[in-house]
């Protein structure tokens, strides 16, 4: 009886730790991606230049705002 209770406590602690760890990791990853987006203005600028477009600051700002809006919408879901 004592051994079974110890195993039960161990398994419950492991499951609770995994659930808490998952949510902490997810929250920290979301905040990291919000602070450091995976693509920057410089990367967009070079991408547009390689496609043969002349990147203006207005276009870059529009694209960055559009990406930010899409990421906010996906976080709400």
Swiss-Prot record:
Membrane topology: Single-pass membrane protein
Pfam families per UniProt: UPF0154
Positions of the UniProt region annotated as Disordered: 50-77
One of the record's GO cellular component terms: plasma membrane
Keyword annotations: Cell membrane, Membrane, Transmembrane, Transmembrane helix
UniProt-annotated location(s): Cell membrane
Domain of life (superkingdom): Bacteria
Main location: membrane
Transmembrane parts of this sequence: 5-25
Family the UniProt entry places it in: Belongs to the UPF0154 family.
Name used for this protein in its record: UPF0154 protein LCK_00994
